[in-house]
Amino acid sequence: MKKLLCAVLLSPLLYSNAVLADDAKQLRETLNGTESLKADFKQTVTDINKKVIQTGAGVFALAHPNQFYWHLTAPDESQIVADGKDLWIYNPFAEEVVIMDFAEAINASPIALLVHRDDATWSQYSVTKKQDCYEIKPKSTDAGITSVNVCFNKGTLNKFNVLDDKGNLSQFDLSNQHSINAADKALFKFVLPENVDVDDQRLKTQ
């Protein structure tokens, strides 16, 4: 913001920033009411010309703090599991598992806000409320993701979409939402399959 802008021009900008801060606060309060969630999802991916390039379905779960589960069952199976420390990406077809540092992997995406509660993570994004949805945008210009929209119905997450920097829009519609139970907690503990190649990228950053 240029120092030479007069107070008249600054006033609406300061008001706008205050509104954005309130929107972020509302989203945090809504998420604070969701300690855990498990749901089925249907995925539709469209390109920059709004042409459908992929559809899919699977199971999605999250729990505070920093636990995440993503199991795409169709059309091709893949799995992402975060236990709060490490993030595991499993491709059964390629028989490969990639292991990443959780903080490094998830912090690159606005989806991080669904499982993070700390101020440092939230300060990296701007939040704008639009009816029952919140648009989350990374402040970094090289994030790879342009925006994420998360939508709620009576306080329950029911859909979200992710727009990348190439114009591809991934839309996810959730159903059968409920809090995780004792048995569901096992979802956040990845069991390494036998006879798979392991690419441990944690070692490369140490």
From Swiss-Prot:
What domain of life is recorded for the organism?
A: Bacteria
Can the keyword Amino-acid biosynthesis be found in this entry's annotation? Answer: no
Keywords associated with the record: Chaperone, Periplasm, Protein transport, Signal, Transport
Among the Pfam families in the record, one is LolA
Which segment of the chain is annotated as a signal peptide?
Answer: 1-21
Cited CDD domains: LolA
State if Nucleotide-binding is listed as a keyword.
no
Q: Which GO terms describe its cellular component?
A: outer membrane-bounded periplasmic space
Q: Name one GO biological process term.
A: lipoprotein transport
Could you list the residue ranges that cross the membrane? none
| Location (main, coarse) | periplasm
- Protein localization: Periplasm
Which InterPro entries would you find in this protein's record? LolA/LolB/LppX, OM_lipoprot_carrier_LolA-like, OM_lipoprot_carrier_LolA_Pbac
Q: How does it assemble?
A: Monomer.
UniProt record similarity statement: Belongs to the LolA family.
What this chain does, per the entry, is described as:
Participates in the translocation of lipoproteins from the inner membrane to the outer membrane. Only forms a complex with a lipoprotein if the residue after the N-terminal Cys is not an aspartate (The Asp acts as a targeting signal to indicate that the lipoprotein should stay in the inner membrane).
Per its record, how is this protein called by name?
Outer-membrane lipoprotein carrier protein
Q: Which organism is it from?
A: Shewanella sp. (strain MR-4)
